[in-house]
């Protein structure tokens, strides 16, 4: 049996079935593609909301990394640079700023001291400079007595302030002075009121003799020779009127300090002395009955540092010039209470009535406490105790 069109009925049925199946497959593929595209578009919309933040954070990290310019391969360069800089700073400090405990053997410096060796502070200062390998010349009225033992002491020589021959030999042997120490008598004990004759003799032997010797030396000095003046000023700043000798000496030193500041050949500094202690006993201001600072740390090392700063390397001199505000601040404080008393109204707290006595303060506090307790009732006093 045949259908119109010339094909068998069976072939036509198979052709219709094949066409239906193929169309169904194409429709399924189109639906699948449409679903996939819709899913992708939705996922893209959701992801676009988070990616800018990630990109911004990544860009910030990249910028920070780029500005630092430190990668894993550059870490050794950074470490090497830090090590080299630290080494240079350490060597520079050791070479130009840190002071050795004493002078090198090849280096020779001369210090002239105007003072009497009978004073314990002056004697200890001479011995400290001698231990640090300085050549020390001592200008004292008792030079004839010390010259008898001069051969037994190397690098310590004595000059009579009234002998011109000693000064001529000194100028020939010493081409340049490192420093001059103007040290009047610094220890007065017992202290108090003295006669006019004794006061006149004390001023002459402690100050006027060395003042005249210094005036003789100044024309032969080079420019900016260091002069350090020692001032026992604690008594004057405390207004202890019963100790007139120390007050007069301190006032004279203050006046000479202002006078010598006008000399171009001198670079003048002044040390105001507090309470200093040699061994277990205080060596000055003994009437205050207070323990003092160790003389080696409070006086000897600062003086050594001042001398080396004025005669050392240019960088050390520059540092000293900066720390003293261009030489305007040339007053130093050495010893216990020396700096504290320089504060305003300090003399009102530590005056002649208290005399640094903590016992009196303790007694006053005890009396005040007992008076308050006596006013209170008996029960409250027991509870307070």
Curated annotation (Swiss-Prot):
This is UPF0744 protein YSD83. Belongs to the UPF0744 family. It comes from Saccharomyces paradoxus. It comes from the Eukaryota. It holds the Pfam family DUF1776. InterPro entries: DUF1776_fun.
């Amino acid at each position: 049996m045949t259908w119109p069109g010339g094909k068998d009925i069976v072939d036509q049925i198979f052709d219709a079935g094949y066409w239906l199946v193929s169309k169904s497959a194409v429709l399924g593929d189109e639906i699948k593609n449409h679903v996939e595209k819709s899913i992708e578009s939705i996922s893209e919309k959701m992801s676009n909301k988070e990616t800018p933040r990630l990109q911004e954070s990544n860009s910030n990290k990249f910028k920070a990394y780029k500005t630092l310019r430190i990668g894993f391969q550059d870490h050794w360069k950074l470490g090497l640079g830090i090590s080299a800089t630290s080494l240079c700073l350490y060597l520079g400090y050791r070479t130009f700023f840190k002071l050795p405990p004493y002078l090198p053997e090849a280096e020779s410096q001369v210090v002239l001291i105007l003072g009497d060796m009978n004073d314990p502070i002056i004697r200890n200062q001479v011995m400290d400079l001698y231990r640090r390998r300085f050549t020390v010349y001592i200008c004292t009225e008792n030079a004839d007595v010390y010259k008898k033992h001069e051969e037994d002491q190397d690098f310590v020589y004595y000059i009579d302030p009234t002998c011109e021959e000693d000064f001529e030999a000194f100028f020939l042997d010493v081409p340049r002075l490192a420093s001059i120490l103007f040290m009047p008598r610094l220890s007065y004990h017992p202290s108090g009121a003295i006669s006019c004759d004794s006061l006149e003799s004390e001023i002459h032997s402690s100050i006027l003799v060395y003042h005249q010797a210094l005036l003789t030396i100044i024309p032969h000095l080079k420019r900016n020779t260091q002069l350090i003046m020692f001032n026992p000023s604690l008594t004057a700043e405390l207004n202890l009127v019963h100790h007139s000798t120390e007050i007069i000496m301190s006032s004279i030193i203050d006046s000479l300090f202002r006078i010598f500041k006008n000399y171009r050949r001198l670079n003048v500094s002044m040390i105001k002395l507090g309470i200093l202690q040699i061994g277990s006993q205080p060596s000055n201001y003994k009437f205050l009955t207070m323990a003092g600072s160790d003389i080696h740390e409070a006086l000897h090392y600062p003086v050594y540092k001042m001398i080396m700063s004025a005669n050392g390397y240019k960088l050390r001199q520059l540092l000293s010039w900066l720390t003293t505000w261009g030489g305007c601040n040339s007053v130093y404080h050495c010893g216990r209470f020396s700096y504290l008393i320089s504060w305003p109204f300090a003399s009102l707290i530590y005056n002649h009535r208290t005399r640094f006595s903590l016992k009196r303060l303790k007694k006053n506090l005890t009396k005040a406490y007992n008076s308050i307790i006596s006013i209170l009732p008996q029960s409250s006093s027991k509870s307070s105790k």
